[in-house]
Amino acid sequence: MTQINFNASYTSASTPSRASFDNSYSEFCDKQPNDYLSYYNHPTPDGADTVISDSETAAASNFLASVNSLTDNDLVECLLKTTDNLEEAVSSAYYSESLEQPVVEQPSPSSAYHAESFEHSAGVNQPSATGTKRKLDEYLDNSQGVVGQFNKIKLRPKYKKSTIQSCATLEQTINHNTNICTVASTQEITHYFTNDFAPYLMRFDDNDYNSNRFSDHMSETGYYMFVVKKSEVKPFEIIFAKYVSNVVYEYTNNYYMVDNRVFVVTFDKIRFMISYNLVKETGIEIPHSQDVCNDETAAQNCKKCHFVDVHHTFKAALTSYFNLDMYYAQTTFVTLLQSLGERKCGFLLSKLYEMYQDKNLFTLPIMLSRKESNEIETASNNFFVSPYVSQILKYSESVQFPDNPPNKYVVDNLNLIVNKKSTLTYKYSSVANLLFNNYKYHDNIASNNNAENLKKVKKEDGSMHIVEQYLTQNVDNVKGHNFIVLSFKNEERLTIAKKNKEFYWISGEIKDVDVSQVIQKYNRFKHHMFVIGKVNRRESTTLHNNLLKLLALILQGLVPLSDAITFAEQKLNCKYKKFEFN
């Protein structure tokens, strides 16, 4: 009989399938019951009479039938399926390393073949409600593809902690080791970073270890940690601290005396720990949702550090002011080129310098994706007005917000009225009914229908372009009453309402729009901003709806603005800002 090559489908010694399932034909035979092996391999003299029982004859017939029916493609397919299942088997090995599983005797070739034939005829491989994965496991358990006993080890790859803890004390971090073994010493790396990024390329021999240095570099889980702090000589200084696994523990252990309130700017493997007091002195506006704890809380324990991982426009402002982009770029360049080796690095640098000299580097057809909507137009194309904005101005031309005197009952029961469940949604028609119809703070309020025409307005997705157009189109609409609701990516919301010469803004932290900059650029009228604090998405939606109810009470005159501001800041996790222009 021709020997079957069970290793035909995987010839590379580096593959996990070969390492775990390098079964030769002899190993296959070693695992079979002795009665079949003795029948198949027993030397029978020519012409000799051999006494064979009926059971042996039947088993031998079944075995030969099963072997003859298996083609090379069937065996390869079986091995491929087994290989696909290896990852799961290996990943759970550590989990049950200490458990000794009972050794189960392998079924005979005939029984295995019949079981396989039965499962195939029953449609085991067909998808069903019970799941394909479970049935594939059953197939592998009953097949000849896997033999022997395996301890399932649960392997978890290294990962880096990408989130920033909100606070950490010296007592918590003193026993945490954040050091990462580096090729160069910390003193040498510090010397490099403090000498204007002087060239420091380590030389590697062409051996197996160093040939993987690029892959090792890309899979590193540590962070290059920089500390941005005050300086007695310069406005500020940026120092390289260490290459660590956790910047929070490292900072709390060794830099808590710099400032125990820290803004963290993260770019890939580089993290900048920026002093809160330094940012306050620079005059950079700190968004309410990204602010750190107050002075009283920080002063209670100087060894307890508070951290905020910044993002969006605030992150961009800090990056621009402290030139963090330059530190990131140079650090990334050097560490990446170092991992490539001297020859590749020299080639790339030569090519890049040539591209820099002939300006090709700045004219390549490469474009960074914009954060804003594709609807953004240039100044010359601003004459095109969004249909959404046009409809708002058209259908709100003849309507006004209801005008009422301040109501003591509403003011005294503001918490109950605003937090009461309602059918309010973020559709334009639903918000129009809330703002333009009499607010039913109790059942005796007469109903009206001032918002019928506004139901024709078709809402569009939010963008900076639409916000600017809405403001621009209202420049000459001094006595108009209208509003706009905008939904951005990640369910971020922005509501703007206009009553005569006053605008009311409700928003959280919006990635695509810096509301303060938009108002400063507009430079007209009076603006009241209600900015929702740092909450999750669900809470932000609830708070936005409650602020819409509060806004309706303000616009209809039922609640004085001062009382509304106090309530919003105390009960709705909101910060109020005011901008006024001539």
UniProtKB/Swiss-Prot annotation:
Signal peptide: none annotated. Phosphorylated. It is found in: Host nucleus. Keywords: DNA replication, DNA-binding, Early protein, Host nucleus, Phosphoprotein, Transcription, Transcription regulation, Viral DNA replication. InterPro entries: TATR. The N-terminal region is required for origin-specific DNA replication and phosphorylation. Belongs to the nucleopolyhedrovirus IE-1 protein family. This is Trans-activating transcriptional regulatory protein.
